Amino acid sequence: MALIIPRSQYVATYGPTVGDKVRLGDTDLWATIEQDFLTKGDECKFGGGKSVRDGMAQSSTATRDNPNVLDFALTNVMIIDAKLGIIKADIGIRDGRIVGIGQAGNPDTMDNVTPNMIIGASTEVHNGAHLIATAGGIDTHIHWICPQQAQHAIENGITTMIGGGSGPADGTHATTCTPGKFNIERMFQACEALPVNIGFFGKGNCSMLEPLKEQVVAGALGLKIHEDWGATPAVIDAALKVADEMDVQVAIHTDTLNESGFLEDTMKAINGRVIHTFHTEGAGGGHAPDIIKAAMYPNVLPASTNPTRPFTVNTIDEHLDMLMVCHHLDKRVPEDVAFADSRIRPETIAAEDILHDMGVFSIMSSDSQAMGRVGEVVTRTWQTADKMKAQRGALGDEGNDNFRIKRYIAKYTINPAIAHGISQYVGSLEVGKLADIVLWKPQFFGVKPEFVMKKGFISFAKMGDPNASIPTPQPVFYRPMFGANAKANTESAVYFVSQASVDANIKAQYGIQKETLAVKGCRDVGKKDLVHNNATPEITVDPERYEVRVDGEHITCEPATKVPLAQRYFLF
């Protein structure tokens, strides 16, 4: 006989279900659960007097030799995912991968248990009833200036970092390239202790093919072209030829000064081949003043970096100072000041907000320590979404913000994964992918996760005083957990590399322990493949006033005077 309980009691016990709305942080974004995979009355909950115990929701007979027995069950959790939608389910993990999204439990005593989601004596359980699960974020614009960036990134929910560099050298301060086999090998060896998945760009600035190919064979997952090394048409063509031959991606920071051509010349050199454009608005660099037009092409995968996200009253002043430092400019040199002024344009930064909301800009990233903040990718994404809701209203008429939420979460999860050929491994919580999972309390969503799992093992978490009698007493701050320690760390994170480097067995050559996974399908994608962010309208820029028009309509917005997910959550 069924027991009827008030909805409020159900939500208090098992969390929200279909139709319930959940506010994300202190934003005005409300997520509504679209589907619930759990069987009412058979929910799994661990604790005193709860259901996950021997002979109830936990099988008495299933051993780990049974391939359907889970290593970890995350129960009753709300999922926000660009591919799965906004749903309620249990997440089943085995051997570091997601094996099920459905109903976990004991099929001997429960109905509708997903066949490969058995809870047994071998299964760890965490109650997710009042938590939100998202896929680990992916930041594709990392300047590897210092290794400490990895901790700040994972504390904001980033679990994959793609970029280049070799430490605090001038080349790394300005460009995201790890040049050549020696530096690539050393960086792989240096990053064994970092708790995140990592991929390195080789230096793509060379007009001959062999110096580029050898970097891909050495382990680069892609090539980065940067104007500071000379982003000429010959360089662009050579890098793309190698990329097409070796199935890697090319990322580009185009020619701000228009030294070797204008945007049209760069697009001619690209010649319809797929390319990932960095800070496509232009404040981070690129053809002045109209690099933003690149976002209208079907072969361009356009990204933003977070210092311009969202457009606020402080954005312009901050950028001028950052630019002078990052690109070794001198305020006493008029040409350097003119260079800086040409890149920082309020009109195009305002348009960038709207292009994100329209799904024209597809990817969000940091530009870590080189004008961007590595620990704010997730936060800045949701601040932009909230600002756009306030200024542009709802997207659609479904009575919630689900579509906008899915559009924005795709920008730092599945879309960068698709762009770099790693979407078969990460980028969503789909079955078969690495169990890189971020858990949030709704009130802290987008700012401070509860904990972060890497390959199904807890790597970082908010943790109280280790000498306290319980885990929660102050001071509570992020600490590395067992998943980030010793050999567990090398088992819990991976390197993304080229197939050519896997064939060359760089893992043995370099003596590294982390698994190497080859990128695939980098040359077969286009803007059409980017989830919820694949619009290709005509974009024009007034060369004197910098006004941006989309399909003939002038787009602009006011700078924000305050943003959510900010001082309410931080002391500084």
Curated annotation (Swiss-Prot):
Residues 136-572 form the Urease domain. It catalyses: urea + 2 H2O + H(+) = hydrogencarbonate + 2 NH4(+). Carboxylation allows a single lysine to coordinate two nickel ions. The modification N6-carboxylysine is found at K224. InterPro entries: Amidohydro-rel (IPR006680), Metal-dep_hydrolase_composite (IPR011059), Metal_Hydrolase (IPR032466), Urease_alpha_N_dom (IPR011612), Urease_alpha_subunit (IPR050112), Urease_AS (IPR017950), Urease_asu (IPR005848), Urease_asu_c (IPR017951). Disulfide bonds: none annotated. One of its GO terms (molecular function) is nickel cation binding. Pathway: Nitrogen metabolism; urea degradation; CO(2) and NH(3) from urea (urease route): step 1/1. One of its GO terms (cellular component) is cytoplasm. Substrate binds at H226. Heterotrimer of UreA (gamma), UreB (beta) and UreC (alpha) subunits. Three heterotrimers associate to form the active enzyme. HAMAP family: Urease_alpha (MF_01953). This is Urease subunit alpha. It comes from Actinobacillus pleuropneumoniae serotype 3 (strain JL03).
